[in-house]
């Protein structure tokens, strides 16, 4: 079972072949595989370390105790387990390595680990070990520590909160109408959360979470790599689909996504973090009056996302669709916003469709193409897509599609033209089916950070 997302208490994993049907097999497997750890012993701690990819070293040199060291590239957790002792006698020491290789401590995090063991709160202890291990694995090196990045992000979000609090006067106003209140180590769980919205006496919050940062390549988010296990089903003899091995990874820094299920943090708020990641091609889609001016963050710029082979480019513009900006749109939009984000994240497949919807003759020249997406909010969210070959700016080379996301999440092609001529309803219907299929294909999202060269 997936973690709850922003707009429902429980979000079930859907069947890929039938999105309207809950995948109960997957649900039960997930439930069985998520049985909480509760073994407070030497073997239990060893199991927990191996489960989350930490190295384990055991020191039994002293007769009455065993010292376990759970080690990553940055973190070191020393757990002293006395023989025949209670959980209250177990000691935990947490240390981190800095860029120079020296150790430093985090007394707050260490105390949370100790308290969880002392109170036999094994689920909380496991969550915190998992969080530490994940951030450790996500750090490409000691010099590029996600723990340091998170500290910088926390400072930025706290500065934003204090600036908004001085303007809006009350904490409640910042939570309801501002950009939220950051909370560190909320309810004993390590990490940074943002309380950002209240509705019907419920306070919504999200945890910032990093996942598997790579050791290679330039900093970017990679969307749509090896999405298809086989070529798509041919819908028409006029469509010449590219094979899987022709898919090219597309780097983009449109959004910094920490956890795809929960919250997409507006890029204005993570500018210091992006700077540390050496990601500089940042765009602010609209002039935000609140903290972009307060903190001197950039207002507007144009961003182009280039293919690795440098022969293609993608330009993305539109609104910053974050949970805390939903107050700007009618209430029925939240369900539809996920549909919009799904379309944007599927733009590799969208480009494949557009490259093949013209004719087989042009398939060879598809390596010099550009896709421009824009998002609008009217009665329904609107996606405006414009496709053309690079260096051919005349109207005869353009394909323009206007898609709307209906209240039930279905996509509707409102308008489609090729070479300035509107296509027939039948042609638009075929395209709509192709687009709908892409929403059922899983996404591979990775975060790349530039290597540190000594």
Swiss-Prot record:
Keyword Transcription: yes
Molecular function terms, GO-annotated: transcription coactivator activity
GO terms, biological process: positive regulation of transcription initiation by RNA polymerase II
Keywords assigned: Activator, Nucleus, Transcription, Transcription regulation
Cellular component annotations (GO), alphabetically ordered: mediator complex; nucleus
Localisation: Nucleus
One Pfam family recorded for the sequence: Med1
Domain of life the protein comes from: Eukaryota
Primary localization: nucleus
Keyword Signal: no
Entries under PANTHER family matching the protein: MEDIATOR OF RNA POLYMERASE II TRANSCRIPTION SUBUNIT 1
Function summary: Component of the Mediator complex, a coactivator involved in the regulated transcription of nearly all RNA polymerase II-dependent genes. Mediator functions as a bridge to convey information from gene-specific regulatory proteins to the basal RNA polymerase II transcription machinery. Mediator is recruited to promoters by direct interactions with regulatory proteins and serves as a scaffold for the assembly of a functional preinitiation complex with RNA polymerase II and the general transcription factors.
Family under the similarity heading: Belongs to the Mediator complex subunit 1 family.
Assembly and oligomerization: Component of the Mediator complex.
Protein name: Mediator of RNA polymerase II transcription subunit 1
Provenance organism: Schizosaccharomyces pombe (strain 972 / ATCC 24843)
Gene: med1
């Amino acid at each position: 079972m997936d973690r709850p997302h922003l707009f429902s208490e429980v979000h079930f994993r859907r069947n890929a072949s039938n999105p309207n049907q809950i995948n109960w097999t997957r649900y039960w497997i997930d439930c069985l595989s998520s049985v909480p750890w509760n073994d407070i012993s030497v073997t239990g701690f060893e199991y927990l370390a191996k489960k989350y990819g930490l190295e384990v070293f055991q020191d039994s040199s002293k007769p009455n105790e065993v010292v376990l060291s759970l080690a990553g590239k940055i973190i070191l957790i020393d757990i002293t387990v006395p023989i025949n002792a209670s959980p209250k006698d177990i000691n935990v020491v947490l240390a981190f390595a800095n860029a120079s290789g020296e150790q430093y401590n985090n007394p707050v995090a260490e105390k949370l680990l100790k308290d969880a063991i002392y109170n036999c709160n094994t689920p909380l202890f496991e969550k915190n070990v998992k969080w530490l291990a994940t951030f450790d694995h996500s750090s490409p090196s000691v010099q590029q520590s996600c723990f340091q990045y998170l500290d910088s992000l926390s400072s930025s979000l706290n500065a934003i909160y204090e600036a908004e609090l001085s303007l809006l006067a009350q904490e409640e106003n910042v939570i309801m109408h501002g950009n939220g209140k950051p909370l560190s180590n909320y309810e004993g769980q390590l990490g940074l959360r943002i309380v950002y919205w209240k509705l019907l006496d419920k306070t919504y919050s999200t945890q910032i979470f990093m996942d598997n940062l790579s050791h290679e390549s330039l900093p970017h988010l990679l969307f749509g790599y090896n999405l298809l296990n086989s070529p798509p089903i041919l819908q028409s003899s006029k469509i010449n689909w590219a094979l899987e091995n022709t898919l090219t990874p597309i780097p983009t820094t449109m959004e910094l996504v920490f956890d795809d299920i929960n919250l997409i943090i507006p890029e204005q708020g993570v500018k210091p973090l992006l700077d540390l990641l050496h990601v500089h091609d940042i765009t602010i889609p609209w002039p935000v009056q609140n903290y972009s001016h307060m903190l001197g963050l950039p207002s507007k710029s144009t961003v182009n996302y280039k293919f690795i082979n440098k022969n293609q480019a993608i330009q993305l513009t539109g609104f910053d669709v974050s949970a805390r900006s939903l107050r700007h749109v009618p209430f029925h939009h939240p369900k539809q916003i996920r549909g919009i984000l799904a379309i944007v994240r599927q733009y590799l497949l969208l480009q494949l469709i557009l490259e093949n919807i013209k004719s087989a003759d042009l398939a060879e020249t598809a390596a010099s193409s550009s896709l421009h997406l824009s998002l609008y909010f009217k009665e329904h969210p609107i996606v405006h897509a414009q496709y053309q070959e690079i260096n051919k700016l005349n109207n005869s080379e353009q394909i323009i599609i206007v898609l709307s996301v209906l209240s039930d999440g279905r996509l509707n092609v409102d308008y489609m033209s090729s070479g300035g001529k509107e296509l027939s309803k039948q042609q638009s219907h075929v395209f709509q089916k192709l687009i709908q299929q892409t929403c059922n294909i899983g996404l591979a999202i990775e975060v790349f950070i530039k290597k540190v060269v000594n």
